[in-house]
Design a protein with these regions (language model features):
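Class I SAM-dependent methyltransferase SAM/SAH-binding core
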Residues: 34, 40-42, 47-92
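Hydrophobic adenine-recognition pocket in adenosine-nucleotide-binding enzymes
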Residues: 108
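C-terminal alpha-helical "lid/dimerization" subdomain adjacent to the S-adenosyl-L-methionine
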Residues: 137-181
Protein backbone atom coordinates (compact mmCIF):
# COMPACT_ATOMS: atom_id res chain seq x y z
CA UNK A 1 0.00 0.00 0.00
CA UNK A 2 2.93 2.33 0.69
CA UNK A 3 4.36 1.74 -2.77
CA UNK A 4 0.91 2.29 -4.27
CA UNK A 5 0.73 5.69 -2.54
CA UNK A 6 4.17 6.70 -3.83
CA UNK A 7 3.40 5.59 -7.39
CA UNK A 8 0.09 7.42 -7.44
CA UNK A 9 1.20 10.72 -5.94
CA UNK A 10 4.55 10.95 -7.71
CA UNK A 11 3.06 10.32 -11.13
CA UNK A 12 4.64 6.98 -11.92
CA UNK A 13 1.36 5.44 -13.04
CA UNK A 14 0.67 8.40 -15.32
CA UNK A 15 4.02 8.17 -17.09
CA UNK A 16 3.60 4.44 -17.76
CA UNK A 17 0.01 4.86 -18.95
CA UNK A 18 0.98 7.70 -21.29
CA UNK A 19 3.73 5.53 -22.76
CA UNK A 20 1.25 2.70 -23.32
CA UNK A 21 -1.19 5.05 -25.04
CA UNK A 22 1.57 6.27 -27.36
CA UNK A 23 2.30 2.66 -28.28
CA UNK A 24 -1.29 1.56 -28.81
CA UNK A 25 -2.28 4.63 -30.82
CA UNK A 26 -5.58 4.16 -32.62
CA UNK A 27 -5.08 0.53 -33.58
CA UNK A 28 -8.22 -1.49 -32.94
CA UNK A 29 -7.24 -4.74 -31.25
CA UNK A 30 -7.15 -6.38 -27.85
CA UNK A 31 -3.73 -5.64 -26.43
CA UNK A 32 -2.14 -8.26 -24.19
CA UNK A 33 0.00 -6.59 -21.53
CA UNK A 34 2.28 -8.35 -19.03
CA UNK A 35 3.12 -6.48 -15.81
CA UNK A 36 6.44 -7.84 -14.55
CA UNK A 37 6.83 -7.77 -10.76
CA UNK A 38 3.26 -6.52 -10.41
CA UNK A 39 3.23 -6.41 -6.60
CA UNK A 40 -0.16 -5.43 -5.26
CA UNK A 41 -1.60 -4.81 -8.73
CA UNK A 42 -1.83 -1.03 -8.50
CA UNK A 43 -0.15 -0.42 -11.86
CA UNK A 44 -2.22 -3.10 -13.62
CA UNK A 45 -5.36 -1.53 -12.19
CA UNK A 46 -4.34 1.99 -13.25
CA UNK A 47 -3.59 0.75 -16.78
CA UNK A 48 -6.89 -1.14 -17.05
CA UNK A 49 -8.90 1.89 -15.91
CA UNK A 50 -7.11 4.27 -18.26
CA UNK A 51 -7.38 2.04 -21.33
CA UNK A 52 -11.05 1.48 -20.57
CA UNK A 53 -11.62 5.25 -20.54
CA UNK A 54 -9.91 5.45 -23.94
CA UNK A 55 -12.03 2.53 -25.19
CA UNK A 56 -8.95 0.37 -25.76
CA UNK A 57 -9.47 -3.32 -25.14
CA UNK A 58 -6.78 -5.17 -23.22
CA UNK A 59 -5.93 -8.19 -21.13
CA UNK A 60 -3.34 -7.73 -18.39
CA UNK A 61 -1.35 -10.49 -16.72
CA UNK A 62 0.46 -9.48 -13.54
CA UNK A 63 3.39 -11.68 -12.56
CA UNK A 64 4.97 -11.74 -9.11
CA UNK A 65 6.72 -14.22 -6.85
CA UNK A 66 4.97 -13.32 -3.59
CA UNK A 67 1.79 -15.32 -2.96
CA UNK A 68 0.51 -12.96 -0.25
CA UNK A 69 1.00 -9.94 -2.47
CA UNK A 70 -0.83 -11.64 -5.32
CA UNK A 71 -3.73 -12.53 -3.04
CA UNK A 72 -4.02 -8.84 -2.16
CA UNK A 73 -3.81 -7.89 -5.86
CA UNK A 74 -6.49 -10.40 -6.87
CA UNK A 75 -8.86 -9.06 -4.23
CA UNK A 76 -8.26 -5.45 -5.25
CA UNK A 77 -8.70 -6.15 -8.97
CA UNK A 78 -11.58 -8.62 -8.64
CA UNK A 79 -14.01 -6.34 -10.50
CA UNK A 80 -11.76 -6.20 -13.58
CA UNK A 81 -12.10 -9.39 -15.60
CA UNK A 82 -9.36 -8.27 -17.97
CA UNK A 83 -6.75 -8.55 -15.18
CA UNK A 84 -5.31 -11.88 -14.09
CA UNK A 85 -2.29 -12.86 -12.02
CA UNK A 86 0.40 -15.50 -12.15
CA UNK A 87 2.89 -16.52 -9.48
CA UNK A 88 6.41 -17.14 -10.79
CA UNK A 89 10.05 -16.60 -9.81
CA UNK A 90 10.96 -13.93 -12.32
CA UNK A 91 14.61 -13.91 -11.29
CA UNK A 92 15.03 -17.61 -12.05
CA UNK A 93 17.19 -17.93 -15.16
CA UNK A 94 14.71 -20.47 -16.57
CA UNK A 95 11.79 -18.04 -16.36
CA UNK A 96 10.32 -16.78 -19.63
CA UNK A 97 7.19 -14.76 -20.30
CA UNK A 98 4.31 -15.86 -22.48
CA UNK A 99 3.83 -14.01 -25.81
CA UNK A 100 2.45 -10.51 -25.33
CA UNK A 101 2.09 -7.20 -27.12
CA UNK A 102 3.51 -4.97 -24.38
CA UNK A 103 5.76 -5.82 -21.43
CA UNK A 104 5.65 -3.29 -18.59
CA UNK A 105 7.37 -3.06 -15.23
CA UNK A 106 7.67 -0.46 -12.50
CA UNK A 107 10.06 -0.40 -9.56
CA UNK A 108 11.14 -4.00 -10.07
CA UNK A 109 14.03 -4.14 -12.53
CA UNK A 110 16.52 -3.08 -9.85
CA UNK A 111 16.26 -6.65 -8.52
CA UNK A 112 18.29 -7.76 -11.57
CA UNK A 113 22.05 -7.37 -11.86
CA UNK A 114 23.14 -5.86 -15.17
CA UNK A 115 24.36 -9.18 -16.58
CA UNK A 116 21.21 -11.04 -15.55
CA UNK A 117 19.02 -8.28 -17.00
CA UNK A 118 20.84 -8.53 -20.33
CA UNK A 119 20.21 -12.28 -20.39
CA UNK A 120 16.57 -11.78 -19.40
CA UNK A 121 16.00 -9.29 -22.21
CA UNK A 122 17.73 -11.47 -24.78
CA UNK A 123 15.67 -14.50 -23.75
CA UNK A 124 12.34 -12.67 -23.68
CA UNK A 125 12.55 -10.22 -26.58
CA UNK A 126 11.03 -12.74 -29.02
CA UNK A 127 7.88 -12.94 -26.88
CA UNK A 128 7.15 -9.18 -27.08
CA UNK A 129 5.51 -8.12 -30.34
CA UNK A 130 5.32 -4.35 -29.87
CA UNK A 131 6.99 -2.61 -26.92
CA UNK A 132 8.74 -2.86 -23.58
CA UNK A 133 8.01 -0.09 -21.07
CA UNK A 134 10.01 0.08 -17.82
CA UNK A 135 9.74 2.84 -15.23
CA UNK A 136 12.63 2.65 -12.80
CA UNK A 137 14.55 4.79 -10.36
CA UNK A 138 17.73 6.40 -11.67
CA UNK A 139 20.73 6.03 -9.40
CA UNK A 140 22.40 9.24 -8.28
CA UNK A 141 23.76 10.63 -5.02
CA UNK A 142 21.33 13.52 -4.78
CA UNK A 143 18.34 11.18 -5.00
CA UNK A 144 19.81 9.07 -2.21
CA UNK A 145 20.36 12.07 0.08
CA UNK A 146 16.96 13.56 -0.67
CA UNK A 147 15.16 10.29 0.03
CA UNK A 148 17.03 9.79 3.32
CA UNK A 149 16.08 13.24 4.60
CA UNK A 150 12.53 13.42 3.25
CA UNK A 151 11.25 9.86 3.69
CA UNK A 152 10.29 10.46 7.32
CA UNK A 153 7.73 13.01 6.06
CA UNK A 154 6.03 10.51 3.75
CA UNK A 155 3.12 8.33 4.94
CA UNK A 156 4.92 5.10 4.08
CA UNK A 157 6.00 2.12 6.15
CA UNK A 158 9.50 1.51 7.50
CA UNK A 159 9.78 -1.43 5.12
CA UNK A 160 8.89 0.79 2.16
CA UNK A 161 11.53 3.33 3.23
CA UNK A 162 14.18 0.62 3.45
CA UNK A 163 13.10 -0.77 0.08
CA UNK A 164 13.26 2.70 -1.43
CA UNK A 165 16.87 3.19 -0.32
CA UNK A 166 17.82 -0.25 -1.60
CA UNK A 167 16.12 0.46 -4.92
CA UNK A 168 18.10 3.68 -5.40
CA UNK A 169 21.38 1.95 -4.50
CA UNK A 170 20.76 -0.93 -6.91
CA UNK A 171 19.12 1.02 -9.73
CA UNK A 172 20.94 1.72 -12.99
CA UNK A 173 22.32 5.00 -14.24
CA UNK A 174 21.46 6.19 -17.73
CA UNK A 175 24.93 5.18 -18.92
CA UNK A 176 24.39 1.67 -17.55
CA UNK A 177 21.00 1.43 -19.25
CA UNK A 178 22.60 2.32 -22.59
CA UNK A 179 25.16 -0.46 -22.14
CA UNK A 180 22.47 -2.97 -21.12
CA UNK A 181 20.31 -2.18 -24.15
CA UNK A 182 23.28 -2.44 -26.51
CA UNK A 183 24.35 -5.81 -25.07
CA UNK A 184 20.76 -7.09 -25.23
CA UNK A 185 20.56 -6.20 -28.92
CA UNK A 186 17.85 -3.55 -28.54
CA UNK A 187 18.47 -0.84 -31.10
CA UNK A 188 15.22 1.13 -31.15
CA UNK A 189 14.31 2.76 -27.84
CA UNK A 190 13.89 5.99 -25.90
CA UNK A 191 15.21 6.78 -22.43
CA UNK A 192 13.29 9.63 -20.83
CA UNK A 193 13.98 11.25 -17.46
CA UNK A 194 10.72 11.69 -15.54
CA UNK A 195 9.98 13.01 -12.03
CA UNK A 196 11.18 12.12 -9.51
CA UNK A 197 14.60 10.65 -10.34
CA UNK A 198 13.18 8.01 -12.65
CA UNK A 199 13.97 6.69 -16.09
CA UNK A 200 11.19 5.72 -18.46
CA UNK A 201 12.40 3.20 -21.02
CA UNK A 202 10.28 2.53 -24.08
CA UNK A 203 11.82 0.04 -26.49
CA UNK A 204 10.56 -1.60 -29.65
CA UNK A 205 12.18 -5.04 -30.00
CA UNK A 206 10.61 -5.87 -33.37
CA UNK A 207 11.78 -2.67 -35.06
CA UNK A 208 15.04 -2.43 -36.93
CA UNK A 209 17.46 0.43 -36.40
Amino acid sequence: QSLEWVNRWFGNHRSVVKAILRVTGKEKKTWHIIDLGCGGGDLALAVAKSLSRHKIECTITGIDGNANTLAYAEKKCAAFNEISFLQADILDNQFTIQPCDILISSHFIYHFSADVLVDFLRNNLPAVSTAIIFSELKRNRFAMRLFKFSSFLLPISKLAKEDGLLAIKRSFSEKEWLAILQQAGIGTYSLQSVPLFRILLTSYPARKI
